[in-house]
């Protein structure tokens, strides 16, 4: 009986330690604060990258970044995946207005509440020169790796 309780307790500890981690995300995706992320090394235009993300599953988009903690997590993920890359990495922000100012929403519909922009063009990526810690504006037709984001799976 004591051994059964010990094994049951051990399984409970393992289950609880996995909750909120990558266990809730698809294989090879990383988990952070209730979302799943994956850096894709495929080179795509901003629009093709967003289309690729949305084709993975319902509700998935290019990554939105809503806090400095999330920015640091995504930058580390990109740096680890895109080692020795000569490319920037697309995120889910693009200027859709004709007034040359930043859109107020990410591709997943969430509001822009955190930003670190280095200069203006049309689509936004993470700047490889800053180890993906700063945003950079790039021509939307450039081909770059990209980061998809979704809610954790339940």
UniProtKB/Swiss-Prot annotation:
GO CC annotations on file: extracellular region
Domain C-type lectin intervals: 32-149
Pfam families xref list: Lectin_C
Disulfide-bonded cysteines: 25-36, 53-148, 123-140
An annotated Gene Ontology molecular function: toxin activity
Signal peptide (from-to): 1-23
Gene3D superfamilies membership: Mannose-Binding Protein A, subunit A
Main location group: secreted
Coiled-coil regions, chain positions: none
UniProt keywords, alphabetically: Disulfide bond, Hemostasis impairing toxin, Platelet aggregation inhibiting toxin, Secreted, Signal, Toxin
Tissue expression: Expressed by the venom gland.
Location(s) in or outside the cell: Secreted
Protein role: Inhibits ristocetin-induced platelet aggregation via binding to platelet glycoprotein Ibalpha (GP1BA).
Subunit structure, interactors included: Heterodimer of subunits alpha and beta; disulfide-linked.
Similarity comment: Belongs to the snaclec family.
Protein name per UniProt: Snaclec dabocetin subunit alpha
